[in-house]
Structure formats: structure tokens, C-alpha cells
């Protein structure tokens, strides 16, 4: 079966994205394999987002605008609820795959054809995607561009699920504190699906991730809190913070990440994940740590340079 024989639909939650969404729409319109339907869910946008989308709905019958009521609270549960509302409009259709596409993403014209091909090649592939790049002048600079990258994780900005897998994980769980995409992908692995990021292609993320409401340093602090929130192992997350010391913001970014994790631990921040998922997550982290521990010894024995810990 070729990738072109598979069909897909897209849902895009969007809130005040007038600066980016037109480029996203143009990227999808230019695809060599277009979606069967695309529902763009405006989450109470108060800028020009809706009018931009309406212009394209008049040109392309497979694009639909769904407007949610206006509200002031910007949080991740709202994004999950928007996705669910958009997906409800699609469930009666016949399709194989469903994609979650952020409203500030662009990519090349064969992006989805490439991903559809991966699903055709791998019957157990449940979720896939590619790295995202935040600086278009450095397309090879992303969090998967090193030897220690976790290719089983799929970033939430542009995920695509096999329909059966999406049903198995229960869709995106509406959790106010975030990590809805991480929970979906990790649950998929726990239920026996393969999840994979393919680095042969990238997409471009035009708003720096994690900085919508925070400075870069506070974004790192909140990432640390989130690492605790989803049940990350203390040893792994502390080492992860030290590995991030070399990243921008230099030194402080990694320390803020560690501080966020341990602040959440000391204040006993509520964790929304099940004990089963937390245990699975920690077991995966410890398995990766053992593999990383063995790799330097094997590399030294073979006289091979060991990759840095950036982005672990």
C-alpha cells in the first residue's frame, strides 16, 4: 500500500493566530496529498484569525472554521477541548489518520505524503511526526539533532495518529496544566503502539515554544514543573537539567529547569497521570539512562566520539 492510498484529516486549535495562521494554511493547501477535511477551531479569537480562515474556506470546501465561545483563560485544557470539538465534526467521515496541527507551523509540500508513507510501511505505527525548527536559518538545529535524542517521542506541534491508535488512547485528555500531547503519545506506547519521530524532514515552528506567556527562563522553570507533573524520575530529570546548561539561556536555563522540577516536588504539585502511566514513563527513562551509560564505554572502546547530552 502506498502512502497516497491512506487518507487523513486535520484539526487545528487556534487562538489569536493572525500573525501565523495564513502561512500554515498555505502550507497545507500546497500539499501533494491534501487532507480529506480540515477543521480549524477558533478558540474565541479576538484578532483577525477568523477572517483569514474564512477567506480560505470560501476557496477550499474541505477547510472548515468552527468558532468556540470567547474566553480569557488561556490554558491547555482549552486546547484539548477545542481539538475534541473539531474532531467531533470529522468522526462520521471515512479516514485512516488524524493530525493535530498547531496554527503557527509550516512545512514543505510533500510533508504529509512523507508521513503517510511511514504509516503504510509500519502497520504498528500509531503516532508520528518530525522535529520542529524554530530558526529557519538553521534547519538542522533541533532537539533531535544529536545522538542521545529520544526518537520515540513525537512533538505536539504537528502530530498525526492512526485512527485506531487515537481511539485506543482516548484522544487528548483535557488537563489544565498541559502535557496533553505527551500523555497521548506515551499512552500509545504503553498500549503497544509504535511512536516515532522521523528526522528526514522538519516543520517550522514560528512562535518560540513555551514562551507564549513566559520569559525564556520562566518557560524553562515551567518545563521543570511539567516534568514532575507527568511523573518524571528525579534522577533522570536532574541529569536532564544539567545537560541543558549548555543551551540558551546559557547555564541558567538548565538550572531553572531543575529548580522547577524540585519546586514542584517539594510543594507536592498535583500529578494528573495514572500510576500505571507514571511507572511506564519512569521505566522508559531508566532504560534510556542505562543505554546512555553503556554507550560512552562502547564508544571509548571503539575510539568513537560520544555525543553531547543536549536536549536529552
Whereabouts are the PLM-identified features?
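Non-catalytic, C-terminal membrane-associated alpha-helical segments of glycosyltransferases
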Residues: 219-312
Amino acid at each position: 500500500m502506498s502512502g497516497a492510498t491512506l487518507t487523513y484529516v486535520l484539526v487545528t486549535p487556534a487562538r489569536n493566530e493572525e500573525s501565523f495562521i495564513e502561512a500554515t494554511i498555505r502550507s497545507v493547501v500546497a500539499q501533494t496529498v491534501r487532507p480529506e477535511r480540515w477543521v480549524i477551531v477558533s478558540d474565541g479569537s479576538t484578532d483577525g484569525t477568523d477572517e483569514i480562515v474564512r477567506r480560505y474556506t470560501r476557496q477550499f470546501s474541505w477547510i472548515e472554521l468552527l468558532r468556540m465561545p470567547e474566553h480569557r483563560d488561556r490554558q491547555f485544557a482549552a486546547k484539548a477541548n477545542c481539538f475534541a470539538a473539531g474532531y467531533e465534526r470529522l468522526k462520521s467521515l471515512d479516514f485512516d489518520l488524524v493530525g493535530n496541527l498547531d496554527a503557527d507551523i509550516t512545512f514543505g509540500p510533500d510533508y504529509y505524503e512523507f508521513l503517510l508513507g511511514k504509516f503504510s510501511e509500519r502497520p504498528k505505527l500509531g503516532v508520528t511526526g518530525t522535529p520542529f525548527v524554530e530558526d529557519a536559518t538553521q534547519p538542522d538545529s533541533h532537539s533531535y539533532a544529536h545522538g542521545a535524542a529520544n526518537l520515540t517521542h513525537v512533538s505536539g506541534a504537528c502530530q498525526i495518529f492512526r485512527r485506531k491508535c487515537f481511539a485506543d488512547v482516548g484522544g487528548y485528555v483535557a488537563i489544565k496544566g498541559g502535557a496533553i500531547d505527551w500523555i497521548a503519545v506515551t499512552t500509545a506506547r504503553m498500549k503497544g503502539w509504535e511512536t516515532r519521530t522521523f528526522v528526514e524532514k522538519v516543520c517550522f515552528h514560528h512562535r518560540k515554544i513555551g514562551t507564549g506567556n513566559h520569559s525564556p527562563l520562566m518557560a524553562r522553570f515551567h518545563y521543570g514543573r511539567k516534568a514532575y507533573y507527568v511523573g518524571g524520575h528525579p534522577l533522570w530529570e536532574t541529569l536532564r537539567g544539567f545537560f541543558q546548561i549548555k543551551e540558551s539561556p546559557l547555564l541558567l536555563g538548565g538550572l531553572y529547569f531543575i529548580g522547577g522540577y524540585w519546586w514542584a516536588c517539594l510543594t507536592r504539585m498535583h500529578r494528573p497521570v495514572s500510576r500505571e502511566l507514571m511507572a511506564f514513563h519512569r521505566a522508559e527513562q531508566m532504560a534510556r539512562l542505562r543505554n546512555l551509560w553503556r554507550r560512552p564505554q562502547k564508544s571509548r572502546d571503539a575510539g568513537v566520539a560520544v555525543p553531547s547530552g543536549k536536549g536529552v
